[in-house]
Each structure stands twice: as C-alpha cells, then as structure tokens.
Amino acid sequence: MSDNLTHDADAMEPAEGHDQAATKAAVFAAAERLFALRGFQNVSVRDITAEAGVNLASVNYHFGSKDALLFEIFRRRTGELNRERARMLHEAADRHAGAPPVREILEALFAPPLRWADPANARRVSVQFIIRARSEGTEEIRDVLQNDVSHLERFAEALKKACPALPPESVYWRLHFCLGLVHNNRFVEFDRLNHLSGGLTREGDVTALLSRMLDFAEAGFLA
C-alpha cells in the first residue's frame, strides 16, 4: 500500500487509546528507531505506525508526511546535540576568562556526539539516526547541512582566539578536519580497526577514546 494516505484519513486524529501528545511522541520515537536501523527508504508509514502501535493516519495528522517527520527528528536531535556542545564551550570559556585553550574547545565539539554514541547510552539511536540522515536524508536536510553553520561559527571564533598566529583560513581547514574525526569515529567501526591492529586497539571506554581523539586533534591544530 502507498504511503500516500487519503485526504479523509489525513484529517482524522486517531486518538483511540492515546491522547494526541502521546500518539505524536510514540510516532516520533518509533520513526527514529526504524530510520536509524533500516534507513529512510526502507521504512514505510505503515512500518512506523505499526511499531508505534497507533493508527495509520497518525504520521500525516501529526507531521504532514514521512519526509516532514524525518526532518522534524533531524531538526530536534541536531538541535539538542548542538546545544550540549554550546553549553560545554560556554563552560570552558567561563573557566578561562573567555579564552579557553584549543583542547577544551575541541572537547566541547567532540564529547557530546561521542558520549551519545556509547553503546550503553540510550541516546545512541539518535546518533545512528543523525548519521543516516546525513547520508540518506531529504533535500531539505541536505540544504541544512550545507548552509546552516551557525553552531560551528562559535567554535571557529573560539579557535581563532586560541590560535592568534594561525591564518583564519588555516583555522577553518583544521576545524573541518576535526569534524571528520567526529564523523568517522563511531563504536560500530572499531571491530575493523581491532582486526587491522591484531587486537591492539579494542576500545569500549568513551573517556579513553575521547582522550585519544583530543591528543591527535590538539597536536594537529597546533602543528
């Protein structure tokens, strides 16, 4: 059956057994899990509502469409992640009279997504969703990824202040390379590294992994 529901179905709020807020939350959580595990194209509206245990019309009623639901999850989760980063950066600035060192700036950038990705963290599914959305998302998501850099501007400014001898161009390039570290260091990929190293690199400790990443990134930034 197509994901396009009829106008009449769209107009009906399927409230049996659920109040509207609970239904919307159930749809959101189910969609996030399924998109994270299967990918966007492999999940239908019927899959989402079955997982959530709600009426088929719920997705369109509360979010408008599957695409709009995907964007809402992406917007909310990236917003939460970037607010956590901003909070850590602000705290680092407070500790250092407005001029935190490179390592603490990078820690504010790295630590939130790394901690979310910990297999023991309930937030892990949100990171998995964000990763999927970055590679499989809609044109609207791709547009945000390309053009919404406001959350990175504060890091660039802090790094320029911490490295006054570096040309601004170099600061931006080095920040770009540091973002690559974040995007490519996920627990799911460590089995490959462990195989490559003959068992020397097994890492399940977020704190230890964060320290390794910061050692590398700080040295690169200050080189």
Where do the PLM segments sit?
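Residue-level detector of well-ordered alpha-helical segments, enriched
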Residues: 73, 101, 105, 109, ...
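Short alpha-helical scaffolding segments that buttress acidic/His motifs in well-ordered protein cores
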Residues: 109-113, 127-134, 178, 182, ...
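C-terminal peripheral helix-coil segments that are non-catalytic and often amphipathic
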Residues: 1-10, 149-223
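Hydrophobic alpha-helical connector segments
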Residues: 86-123, 175
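Short, leucine-enriched amphipathic alpha-helices that occur as contiguous helical runs
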Residues: 20, 24, 28-32
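Conserved phosphoryl-transfer catalytic core
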Residues: 68, 77-92
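Helix-turn-helix
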Residues: 2, 26, 34-68, 72-76
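Amphipathic alpha-helical packing segments from all-alpha helical-bundle domains
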Residues: 104, 125, 137-163
